[in-house]
Amino acid sequence: MKYDHEILLLQGGGALGAYQAGVYEGLVEAGIEPSWVVGISIGAINAALIVGNPPERRVERLREFWRRISVNVGPPLPAWLDSLRPAVNYMAAMSAATVGVPGFYRPRMPPTSFAMDGTEAALSVYDTTPLKATLEELVDFDLINRGQVRLSLGAVNVCKGTSVYFDTKNTRIHSDHIRASGALPPGFAPVIIDGEHYWDGGVVTNTPITYVVDERPLPNARIIQVDTFNAEGDLPRNLGQVLQRAKDIQYSSKSRFNIDRIQEMGELAAAGRGLLGRLPPGLKSDPDAQKLAAACDERSWLIIRLINTRPSRSGFVKDFEFSRATIEEAWVAGVEDVRRSISGWDKISPKEVGPEVKVYRPTETLPFHNQAAE
């Protein structure tokens, strides 16, 4: 028995999003295609590239995007010079910070400090007009809006401070919705859609699983969540490692918290269904009982959490380090993680999951290991 819904969740993470692209290629190799893709920030860009292309071109389009925005900083270092790699990566990140990333963003000229208050130029360091052009070339928005695969993009309303999802279920998606989902301040300016200003959804939460939880009915689903930041790590030994560890925790902490709460909600829902089943007939029609029944709908969910746990050689600049070597390594890591773990979770059927939420974490700790479903 297959799952009624195959859902792919993609976090934010800048350059780390190449790992997500590799995971998607691994899923394609295994014959898994999502029916719904939810993304935030770079995850929104990857999501649009997936949903906005026919299945046979999706990996090709992802590769083209990541090739365009990665920078060749020179020939690969020989093994005996590998100790220089962190310095080379840092130089690549400084290039991204000072001159921008081709096909993605560029520094504002004149600089923001010379812009008049209230203008778009005064609200960010960089201009994402190049990303708009890239998206409109590589993404078929007519295909997205036909709704064959559902697409949801997380952003935050700047003035209201609330999370918003642009969803093909009720919204016609265009390139500005994707830019809004990735408009992380103060680097990128808010994007105006229908008179409202939107920033990167990661300002509120970097993990879009809470949006899926609110979907009803969704009784039967396999949810593949791809995390770009790892909540677990060693104790920092210098200031650079402090900055990296703080960033990892900041952008990953809600991921585990949300999944733990979802499992607890599943357990409470099962208890609620048991209690409702023992109510006398006269009480089952009570409004409070009916409200409880609606909140305790039966769900058979398998959540696969794939995390790039490999140590970074880019340190605290890893999310804006776009050297081609690093991008390729992240992509390969994503493919390998699917290949190495899929035998442990691909055959877990809805019947085995039962009426509850189970989580499988094949890449959560180092070294890589396969972990049984919880």
Residue ranges of predicted features:
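Short active-site oxyanion
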Residues: 33-36, 196, 301
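Active-site-proximal substrate-binding core of FAD-dependent oxidoreductases
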Residues: 229-230, 237, 355-356, 360
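C-terminal helical/tail subdomains of lipid-metabolizing enzymes
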Residues: 115, 122, 126, 130, ...
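Active-site gating loop/helix substructures
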Residues: 112-218, 225, 232, 237-245, ...
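Solvent-exposed loop/turn segments at secondary-structure junctions
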Residues: 15, 230-231
